[in-house]
């Protein structure tokens, strides 16, 4: 699966639903501006991330997820979860040669952590 992050202009224009339909994507949560699709989407209006793993959000789950993936360089994105990414980064075992994106959000109302790879 893939997570799609719309450009800020799309969000401000409230065209997320239209963009989702155009690309065969669906909203991850009715109140969050992230979409999901079964295949990668190439659009200048979207940033696409390939999902590597998804777990319920907790510090314990995120720490285990990052440690197992041997991630040394981590981009943290968040929507709908009240957390300070810089503070979270300081608690994670960032050891390894891999790089990834951690997306913290709500999926159908549930706090979720998604480890993903940003696509070009």
Segments (PLM) and residue ranges:
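SAM-dependent transferase fold signal centered on methyltransferase-like domains
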Residues: 1-120
């Amino acid at each position: 699966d893939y997570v799609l992050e719309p450009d800020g202009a799309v969000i401000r224009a409230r065209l997320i639903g239209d963009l989702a339909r155009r690309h065969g994507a669906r909203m991850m949560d009715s109140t969050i501006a992230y979409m999901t699709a079964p295949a990668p989407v190439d659009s200048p209006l979207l940033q696409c991330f390939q999902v590597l793993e998804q777990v319920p959000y907790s510090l314990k789950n995120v720490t285990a997820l990052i440690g197992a993936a041997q991630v040394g360089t981590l981009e943290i994105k968040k929507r709908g979860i009240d957390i300070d990414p810089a503070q979270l980064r300081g608690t994670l075992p960032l050891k390894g040669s891999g790089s990834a994106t951690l997306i913290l959000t709500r999926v159908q109302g549930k706090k979720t952590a998604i480890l993903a790879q940003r696509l070009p």
